[in-house]
Amino acid sequence: MTEAIKRSKILAFYGVPQKSDSAVTYTFHRMKGFDSISTSKNPKEYSRQYVDEEFEQTDVVGYTPTVSFEFDRFAGDPVHDDIIAIFNGEKTGADATRPVIMVDMTGTTKSAIKRGFAIVAESEGEGTEMYTYSGSMRVKGDKVFGTATSLDDWQTCTFTETSE
């Protein structure tokens, strides 16, 4: 029988921006304290029925992925602090766009996919035990395939693009 892959073997890293006079760079911090990070592919379909056929045909013509998230707020976590700043500042456009890297930890070489997302604030403060935030990340560009490495036991990572 083949081995099942645990959810904890697919890690998410969020690009926290550092602004300088000349450019914005990102440090990719591990997304900790998240109760949920789930992707909906949201396929775009083209359906039609031809007059000479008794059935409808459907083709998938694109995708609009959305990543839903929820996290318990931890003080001093750079990912939480950045997302909370987007929520509280009701940021829009480029000010609310961040790169995210998904890293597959199951192999020797850590394959990774990097993509830009708009951070969409949805709710905060639910529950009585922990202060929580929830929202979604909506796609802002193509997938970039590569590998990830880390020098600090996967608290942060570095992404290297590979040619497909």
Residue spans of the language-model regions?
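Protruding loop/beta-arch "assembly-hinge" segments enriched in small, turn-prone residues
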Residues: 138-164
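Solvent-exposed edge beta-strands and adjacent loop segments
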Residues: 1-74, 119-131
